[in-house]
Each structure stands twice: as C-alpha cells, then as structure tokens.
Regions:
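His/Asp/Glu-enriched, well-ordered alpha-helical/loop segment
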Residues: 34
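Active-site PLP attachment segment
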Residues: 1-3
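Non-catalytic terminal extensions of PLP-dependent enzymes
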Residues: 9-10, 14-20, 25, 38-190
Length: 190
C-alpha cells in the first residue's frame, strides 16, 4: 500500500504504486539502482564498501607511484580516487592523458576520467570501484606500466590508439562544430 504520504497517487487506480517517477530528481533508473544497492548492502555493508573503495584507491596509487607515475598530490592519502599526471610524458614524448586513456581501451580497460580537475595538467582521475578484486587492480597496474614504457619507446603507437575498438578516435573539433544529434541511415543521407 502506498500510504497517505503519496498525495499525487490515486489509491483506487494503483494501490501498490508510489506514483510517477519524473526527471525533476534526475534519472529515475539510476536513483532506483542506487537505492536498491544501498538497501542490499545494509547498515554494515555501506561502511565496508567505503573502506574497500579507499583501500583500492590507495593500493593503486602506491603501485603506480612505485612504477614511475607521478601522483598529482603525493602527500595526500586517497579517499576513493586519486589523480595521476602524465605531464612528464607529454613534455618528454608528446604523450597526453587522452593517449593513455585511448590506449587502455585496447586492453579492455574502461578509460579513467581525463583532464579533470582542470588545474592538474594532463591528468587521469583514477577511481577504482569497491568491488574490484586485487587481480583486476594488479592487471591495471601492469597495463599502465606497459603503457608508460611504450610512451617512451613507441609514442606514435600510443597516439594512434585505440586499435581494437569499433570506432577509433573521433574528430572532437568536427563534432563540436557540426551538431548532428540524430542518426540518419546511409541510404537516406543526402
């Protein structure tokens, strides 16, 4: 039963509904998934996953630092995310944060947020989830180290990545200037 607190629902029409979900509160599907996730974790589970997220971020930060990456804020302990700057690689070989992100895609790794925050040059905002296993984190470290080495030995290869995705690098300038917001099948294109 919906109870008396949902004034916008007619009980006679839908006795078990909480009413219409609309966009005023954001994406209703995302909100519902977040709510279900929090409820499934429960009172004890929420602090535990926060601890795992922090542990994963600090582990990755330490491992990447050991392998030659520059942390934007090395004196800080990571909360659930940390920032790596590849500005030294850009200065040495012209390799950018975008090149690292695109190269990760070839290894089946979702690219981290790049160029945020804007005050850190050539940065990657790395945010491992609380559910990543140590094996997955270690694989990420191995791939990042390989890319760091490749940025020095074969920078042109990294500038061309990704090679294995259905779509390679998009023309960002063209996309910003020509706002095609609808798909037109090739047979109907002018």
């Amino acid at each position: 039963d919906t109870g008396p607190w949902y004034r916008f629902v007619r009980k006679k029409d839908r006795p078990f509904s909480i009413g219409r979900l609309s966009a005023f509160a954001g994406n209703a599907g995302v909100l519902l998934r977040a709510y279900v996730y929090a409820r499934l974790l429960g009172r004890e589970g929420m602090p535990r996953v926060a601890e795992y997220a922090t542990l994963n971020a600090n582990y990755l930060a330490a491992q990447l630092r050991k392998r030659g990456f520059t942390l934007a804020y090395p004196e800080r302990r990571a909360s659930h995310e940390f920032i790596v700057t590849v500005a030294p690689q850009k200065k040495a070989n012209g390799i950018t944060a975008l090149d690292f992100s695109k190269s990760l895609l070839d290894h089946g790794i979702h690219a981290p947020t790049n160029y945020f925050p804007l005050l850190v040059p050539e940065c990657l905002l790395i945010e491992p989830t609380e559910t990543e296993s140590k094996d997955t984190l270690d694989r990420f470290v191995v791939v990042m180290k390989m890319l760091l080495d490749k940025s020095a030995s074969n920078p042109d290869w990294m500038k061309g990545a990704p090679y294995t995705t259905p779509v390679r690098r998009l023309d960002d300038v063209k996309a910003a200037k020509e706002l095609d917001l609808a798909y037109v099948p090739p047979s109907r294109a002018a």
